[in-house]
Amino acid sequence: PEGFRALYAKQGDSLITQGFICADASGKTAILGRGGSDTSAACLGALLGAERVETWTDVPGMFSANPRQVPQARLLSRLDYEEAQEIASTGAKVLHPRSISPCREARVPLWIRDTSRPDFEGTVIGPRQAGAAAGVKAISSKSGIVLVSMDGIGMWQQVGFLADVFERFKRHGLSVDLIGSSEANVTVSLDPSDNLVNSDVLERLCADLAEVCRVKVIAPCASITLVGRGMRSLLHKLSDVLAAFGRERVHL
């Protein structure tokens, strides 16, 4: 970081650089993929120990729900790093989840600003505030995800079963998003935005998993996530939420 700051200092008061472009382990030019510009800005800000990182986009910040789907969604003016990470990871597209970690580790605030309303404060993401009350901050959703359900009586308390299963996902280059488990079932979700999930890949994965369990693919699916602090302490207050899932016959 010190060498980087010294290099930056030689450039004068302002440095204009590109995002999205990086180098791989062998030093060859590569691209960071979706959200690469957000990630570049966050990494540069963290390395420089910047006062803040500002991401300018076409929306004023993060909302309590998708405003295109929920017109009464509220703009969230303040979030801590963990809350923002969860909202971004579970469906919000305004900020890539990968861009939050560098700022969190360097304790650099991250601001989301609106290019069409430059005087608007937007959303400020920073350290958790002391005494933050438990509560639901946002509802996020993802669509088009793939569920892989794995059943087997023998999996209960079988040493190494999950390690064996996830090794097979790794073998096929698949990263798991959400996980649900019971005594005789493990269900995981695959996000197509982070994985190459086509019929050929799923067919090979199922053939591999069939060696250790019964497997079923369910797609397309959607996930709905409640994001907040101290959620376990609020379970007794979420009866209306759970009832809404029941009315719509949504599996939990």
Descriptions of predicted regions:
Residues 1-252:
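C-terminal catalytic "cap/lid" subdomain
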